[in-house]
Amino acid sequence: MASLKDMRVRIASTKATQKITKAMQMVAASKLRRAQMAAEAARPYAEKMDSVISNIAGAAAGSPGAPVLLAGTGKDQVHLLLVCTGERGLSGAFNSSIVRLARERAYALMNQGKEVKFFCVGRKGYEQLRRTFDKQIIENLELRSVRQLGFVNAEDIAKKVIARFNAGEFDVCTLFYSRFKSVISQIPTAQQLIPLVVEAPAAGSVATSYEYEPEEDEILSTLLPRNLAVQIFRALLENNASFYGAQMSAMDNATRNAGDMIRKQTLIYNRTRQAMITKELIEIISGAEAI
């Protein structure tokens, strides 16, 4: 059985840990609101841009001059999985849920005889994926030094992806990230970026015909690379909000668990101390009676 001194040290250590988790919870809560507002502000822009490009692409998809980012290579043999995770842990299942979705997709593709490559954005995703896919990770980009996420960060990632696509390194690119829903709910999401998936018009909707100047192919050659950066930027913002939401929830649970542990340890300490005092009193009384 542990001594009273060991118990006091353990209780003090748990209290110190509780202070840390409480502080981390408060920091995450303060950063969550701003991150949530940024993610929610980016959604309509990204969705509308995707919709507009899909509208233009619907007319240009079958033309011989359609941009390769829209038409694709004509094959789907080599898949690039662009996995965006966080730079830090202590955030519950935030990182592992994204990696799990990407890993499941990778195994499904490999079972079909496809080749899979990984482009990791974020240290935590890279650390988990390299255990099983070390030779298939072609690039790892960390954003630890970035104080404030900006569109320039997404543009940099998009340029690297497009450069590899133009070099013929892959046929299909799929983005993996966590969509923020609430503090307690973040949804791992997969979105195909290359070739662009053109959404079919809703059933019963009236198709609208537009005349474009310049031609659709020329417009798309400019918009498609930008749309790729926009979708990646949206994913980074969604990830940022999801991270702080998951961290706030995880640290709240950790703080509560620490409180429960402190109460249990204190109860054991008091009972042990009481038993020792009782034992000493019995020994004193027994000694006095013997005299």
Curated annotation (Swiss-Prot):
One of its GO terms (molecular function) is ATP binding. Signal peptide: none annotated. SUPFAM superfamilies: ATP synthase (F1-ATPase), gamma subunit. Gene3D superfamilies: 3.40.1380.10, ATP synthase, gamma subunit, helix hairpin domain. It is found in: Cell inner membrane. Keywords: ATP synthesis, Cell inner membrane, Cell membrane, CF(1), Hydrogen ion transport, Ion transport, Membrane, Transport. GO terms for biological process: proton motive force-driven plasma membrane ATP synthesis. The keyword RNA-binding does not apply. One of its GO terms (cellular component) is proton-transporting ATP synthase complex. It is a peripheral membrane protein. Belongs to the ATPase gamma chain family. F-type ATPases have 2 components, CF(1) - the catalytic core - and CF(0) - the membrane proton channel. CF(1) has five subunits: alpha(3), beta(3), gamma(1), delta(1), epsilon(1). CF(0) has three main subunits: a, b and c. Produces ATP from ADP in the presence of a proton gradient across the membrane. The gamma chain is believed to be important in regulating ATPase activity and the flow of protons through the CF(0) complex. PANTHER family: ATP SYNTHASE GAMMA CHAIN, ATP SYNTHASE SUBUNIT GAMMA, MITOCHONDRIAL. This is ATP synthase gamma chain. The gene is atpG.
